[in-house]
Each structure stands twice: as structure tokens, then as C-alpha cells.
């Protein structure tokens, strides 16, 4: 794996000149090796180092970007329809044995691109998982939810209907959006721009969080940016301006719960009485 990084780094510096016809076999093989490792979950765009801290493997993201320079659009059969794209489906060559061994469910017309990883006991309702994404075991990706490029989704997460988890291939220095273990993301919520939602959080319906979103803790008065602390229950809200003439959207941490409480208490109960 270490021998792949310098090949990717060097090729990325001249990516504007690379085409499917002039790319060297060495570059093609290195990029496809990275995509295959991502697809199997043996390599990740971001990795947890300790606690709630994550490290981004920027060179892996560069390999994903390079993959778009190496492929022409191609005809992709879809059974009841057809597609035309540079990246094949993760399941293009799957048979029933492959699905059984994968240990996950895929409900039509869910789509996952080659280079995404789907863990054991994951359920993909009609949803979309982009290249470089990692969906860990026991997670539900509900109807019309989107897992963006290189996003990292933890264990036993529920992404409710219409949820959007942002992708961050461009700009390449940006970190991926990360959802920690045992989180619940409510319907039609959006978490984007490399925001980290730490473990055991509950995000209510219709909450939008980007890097510039104020995340206000009503118990302490503290304002966070880009990170939702572990165990937070979050709803949408507003904060007034200093002169009181207007208010702007924010996300509000209304309470904190531990993993034990989260496992015993229903989501609706946590969101009642806030």
C-alpha cells in the first residue's frame, strides 16, 4: 500500500494533462488498486485515530479524483434501464453468492459506486452511496438518503429519509464529512463540508450543518463550529443578532445523552420535552 502513495501523488500534480489514452499503466494500476482497496474496506479516506479524532488520507482522495481522469464514459446496463458514466456500479458483477457473502441488503433502485464500502448488516433502501464512502456495519441508509464521496458513516447509524451527507473531493484539502457510531440523523437533514458528528448523537428532522453553522449549546452557552460533540441531541433554531434586529439560523444542542440512555430510550422520547 505504501508503494502506491508516491505514484498517486506524482500523477496528481500533472492531473490536468492525464487522459484515458495517455495515462501510463503504472498510474492506471495504482489508481485501480486504491479503488479496489476502498471497495473492500481495506483502505479508507479517513481513519479514527483515538477517541473522537480522525485523520484524513489526502492521497487516497487524490486517487479517487484521478480515477475520473482515467476512464471514459461507458454504457452501463441496469436491468430496467441503462446508464452512461465513468464509474461502474459497485454491484455490476455481483451474483447472489456475492451479496450473501457481503451480508448487506440492497433495495431497488439503490445505487453504490465502485470504490465505496458497504459493511455487514447494512441496509440500503433506494438511496445513493458515492465513490470513496465507507458505510460501517449495522447502518440503515433510508429512502432517498445520499452518502457523498468519501463520507465516513459509523456503526449502527440511521440515516433517515432524504438525508444528505456531503462529499468533499473538491477542494482536495477539505476533510470528509464524518458521522460517528450509533448516531441518528433525522429526515431531510444535511451534514456537509467536512463536519464531524461524534458518537451517539441524535440530529432532529430538518437540521442543516455546515462549517459555518453555529452549533449552540443551550446549557453552557458555548458555540461550536464544524463538530457536534458526542451524545448531543440537536434541533434547528435561531440566534438573535447583538442588536436584536434579526436572527440567523443555527443548530441547537438541547441536551446530552450517554450511549446507555440512547440505547434504551426511543428517538421520539429524546426529542420530546426539549
Curated annotation (Swiss-Prot):
* Principal subcellular localisation of the protein: cytoplasm
Pathway per the UniProt entry: Amino-acid biosynthesis; L-lysine biosynthesis via DAP pathway; LL-2,6-diaminopimelate from (S)-tetrahydrodipicolinate (succinylase route): step 1/3
* Top-rank taxon, per record: Bacteria
Q: Per its UniProt record, what SUPFAM superfamilies does this chain match? A: Trimeric LpxA-like enzymes
NCBIfam families given in the database record: dapD, PRK11830.1
GO BP of this protein: diaminopimelate biosynthetic process; lysine biosynthetic process via diaminopimelate
Q: Name one GO cellular component term.
A: cytoplasm
Keyword annotations for this protein, in alphabetical order, are: Acyltransferase, Amino-acid biosynthesis, Cytoplasm, Diaminopimelate biosynthesis, Lysine biosynthesis, Repeat, Transferase
Protein name listed in UniProt = 2,3,4,5-tetrahydropyridine-2,6-dicarboxylate N-succinyltransferase
Enzyme Commission code(s) on record: 2.3.1.117
Q: Tell me which species this is from.
A: Thiobacillus denitrificans (strain ATCC 25259 / T1)
Note one Pfam family from the annotation. Answer: Hexapep_2
